[in-house]
């Protein structure tokens, strides 16, 4: 049951992330292929991180679901040609990003700190100039994920 649910969650998250990237491409906001890949990774980190704190499922189910989402995501990277070392690097990077975002939330900061960190990470790793408008990507992602969580809640209540 968790595997099936996690597959659905991962598909929904992937759709949100892909739609976000497509929207950025249409607005000519993606500066290079590396910029696009860094944005994908960071969007994934934000969405997975936000799911960790959601109350859409009871805590134990949420943890199992997130573990399975991670496993399926990392397996998809392997299927798409990533080496074991590259997959481990992505896993390590996700964990580092979670720690960074956790630090903002533990200080009772709002999502401005998360958005700033997001934009800074993208610019540093994509070797682009800091684009302050990228801070808003976090808000857009979280809004879309919240809508998806609302759908899950409604489906569970039915």
Question: Model-derived features: where do they sit?
Answer:
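N-terminal interaction modules that seed assembly of large macromolecular complexes
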Residues: 19-64
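Context-gated lysine
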Residues: 3, 26, 31, 36, ...
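Long amphipathic alpha-helical segments
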Residues: 48-115
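Alpha-helical repeat scaffolds in large eukaryotic proteins
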Residues: 18, 22-25, 48-56, 74, ...
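Low-complexity intrinsically disordered segments
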Residues: 87-158
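Short amphipathic alpha-helical segments and their helix-coil junctions
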Residues: 1, 5-35, 124
């Amino acid at each position: 049951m968790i595997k099936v649910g996690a597959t659905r969650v991962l598909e929904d998250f992937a759709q949100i992330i892909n739609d976000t990237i497509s929207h950025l491409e249409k607005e000519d906001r993606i500066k290079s292929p590396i910029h696009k890949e860094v944005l994908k990774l960071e969007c994934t980190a934000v969405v997975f991180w936000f799911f960790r704190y959601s109350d859409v499922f009871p805590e134990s189910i949420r943890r199992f679901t997130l573990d399975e989402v991670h496993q399926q995501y990392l397996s998809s990277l392997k299927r798409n040609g990533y080496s074991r070392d590259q997959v481990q690097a992505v896993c390590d990077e996700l964990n580092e990003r979670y720690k960074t975002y956790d630090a903002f939330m533990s200080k009772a900061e709002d999502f401005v700190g998360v958005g700033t960190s997001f934009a800074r990470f993208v610019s540093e790793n994509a070797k682009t100039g800091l684009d302050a408008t990228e801070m808003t990507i976090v808000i857009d992602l979280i809004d879309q994920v919240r809508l998806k969580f609302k759908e899950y809640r409604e489906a569970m209540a039915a």
